[in-house]
Amino acid sequence: MAKVRAAVVGSGFGGLALAIRLQAAGCRTMLFEKRDQAGGRAYVYRDQGFTFDAGPTVITAPDCLRELFTLAGRSMDDYIELLPVNPFYRLFWEDGYRFDYSADQALIERQIEKKSQADVAGYRQFLKYSEEVFREGYEKLAHVPFLNWSSMVSVAPQLIRLKAYRSVYSMVAKHVRDPHLRQLFSFHSLLVGGNPFTTTSIYTLIHCLER
């Protein structure tokens, strides 16, 4: 029997991951990329001696990368050293306000309290919501193959309960009133190319995921 052959178009993270999985499953795989190097959103631009990262800013789920190396019979530690960064990033506004975004819950709350004491309680409620969305939308559903309409309909009750029909910004604004803080906790959908004002609130799970 002839060996199964597969072609993957695009060598971003998704394309690379798929190609590795196909190859590990015994498929003879060919990867096509129109640019001069692989990476997709992780592309690097060089100009006049400067290097610019197109993204990503942080690796939010390193276990997914580790799994790919394991499938290929390799150890990620032999190739990559992941270093913790604190803060994850520092956000600046035109009026001079800035915020250090990190996994340190106490630091996050101190900065919120300094900016808008009334929003601390609302932020904690938002964090609980983000954690619930993470459990339901990522841990339970992220690896489910929705191959037909009925499989998608089956999860509709959970999505409705989590108010997935609301936007990221709308859900953040429900809990937090300060304009800077609303922007702070709703910009994460930009990391995956989404508009916070139109992207489903399911993407608030990123706040929990990257921590």
How would you describe each model-predicted region?
Residues 70, 186, 204-207:
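Generic alpha-helical structural context detector
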Residues 2-4, 50-52, 152-155, 211:
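A short, structure-level motif marking secondary-structure boundaries and short turns
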Residues 94-200:
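Rossmann-like flavin
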Residues 76-77, 101, 146-147, 205-208:
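Short, intrinsically disordered/low-complexity patches at protein termini
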Residues 3-132:
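N-terminal glycine-rich phosphate/pyrophosphate-binding loop and immediately adjacent elements
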Residues 199-211:
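Residues forming anionic-ligand binding surfaces in small-molecule and nucleic-acid pockets
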Residues 1, 30, 76, 152-156, ...:
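Detector for methionine-enriched segments
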